[in-house]
């Protein structure tokens, strides 16, 4: 009888753990999806994006929204092309403009290029979240170095 109670408690505990796990991830992914869709479908900014002096002007990139998060400036939009082209273009153009690449990574559906220059540092995060593999969500953060 004791072993049945112990197994029943173990099963209840496992069910409790299963019910608690995973919810936060889905919620944050939903928020990210909405944020990316807004950036991917928005109109081009009417004012200049708040990016460091000397930031490369890339014809394939359209910036559609920007915000401040404390001292960090966030600029978002989209890149016309695939993830590999976006990664390679940002890395090449940032280096050509005199920015130091601190880290970069290219995966199947996302990419990051971390940079430093002009007294600022940040990251260009690129993700296939615009609904097409040839239109890439761009999320640029930049803050005082």
Question: What kind of feature is each model-predicted range?
Answer:
Residues 2-11, 16, 21-145:
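An acidic-aromatic pocket/loop used at catalytic or ligand-binding sites
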